[in-house]
Amino acid sequence: MDLGCTGSKFYETPNIDRLAQDGVQFTQAYSSCTVCSPSRAALLTGKYPARLHLTDWIPGYGAPDNAKLKIPDWQKFISSDTTTLPQQFKSAGYSTAIIGKWHLSPDAKQSDNYSPQKYGFDINIGGNHLGQPGSFFSPYKIPNLKDGPTNEFLTDRESNEAVKFIEQNQTKPFFLYLAHYAVHQPIAGKAEVITKFEEKNNRNGQKYNATYAALISSVDDSVGKIRETLKRLKLSDNTIIVFTSDNGGLPKVTDNAPYRDGKGSAYEGGVRVPFIIYWPKANSNQSTQSTPIQSIDIYPSLIEMTGITSQSSTIDGVSLAPLLKSTKALPTRDLFWHYPHYHRVGGARPYSAILSGDYRLIHFYEDNRDELYNLAKDPSESQDLSNSEIEIKNTLKKKLDAWLKSTSAQLPLN
């Protein structure tokens, strides 16, 4: 994992680690998909990607030549009849802003039709159809983000824009979606920070990616800058902070151990993510939570924590507020994933999955095959139990099939 608070001895994230100490860190947190666009849509709507029919990164790779199945005709935007989190807050009188990555528009030609402004954001700085920047150094080659001085670093620029927004709205409620393009490709970092980590590698005889470490450091610096701004403006005691990621780490760039594989895969390494919530009203006696949660839970949690009235009828996530405030256990539930696509980098082939208690079942559509793992005993998913735990496998498969039907999930085609 890439953070000090998740066990890294190489990456340096003192500000994120401090946020984890001051807030609540969830040690079994999941994104709603193994790739970015669906996870972001799920976070902003509280709905599973399967229900949204937005199930791959935009525009997606398509099926490879050796594909056995056809990809369904999936949707590359959030439907206009879906109420988003920024729309909820805007209706409640909040100023709303997105700074950074949007990646929920079909393409450049339709970017304006599906821009963040159409979904409740008053201010949009840098959000468009792109999933990654042209460069992390100015000129950025990002539509609707004015270039800064030559070689200005993108994460720093996004952080400075966030500080400006907070300062401008310090006397009224605000909702800020700071979606850094980091740590996405193209992996880049400031030269002096890269050198620092190269020297650290040399001292310790390690071979970590120093450039990636520098990029992570830029995000950590951003967290520190945001928290310092809130403290300076005396807003810390009245502000909720959520820190998470949209998918697991990129294979070959980072190490998701002990979890198997990474972004774009069917396994834990593709969907296990850091997740920290800072809420001044949370129970101060807890700093970690082992309850399994998913990014769809952010939507109902923020609605309840802020006390605004929800305008959305169907929400798949559950509020974490009771758990955070009193350590009251959440209702028992299963978590689900659906990816009817092919991913060139992570290796995923069309699959659906369910987490039920300690067990995770993955159904692969190409050969109608199931894999079953006990994550409590085997977090690295190295021992498939599908042939030995038949009853559990069948029970989970029935639950998965029922969920797919209830969400009208689009299945891969023969």
Role assignments for model-derived ranges:
Residues M1, F89, K101, A162, ...:
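A short aromatic-rich beta-strand->coil structural motif
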Residues M1-V24, Q383-E391:
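Active-site-proximal N-terminal segment of extracellular/periplasmic enzymes that hydrolyze or transfer
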Residues S8-E12, Y30-V35, P72-T83, G148-E158, ...:
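A short beta-strand-to-alpha-helix junction
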Residues L54-S95, W102-L176, H180-E192, E198-N204, ...:
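Formylglycine-dependent
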Residues D122-I123, G249-D255, D261-E268, N283-S284, ...:
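C-terminal cap/loop subdomain of S1 sulfatases and analogous C-terminal strand-loop tails that border
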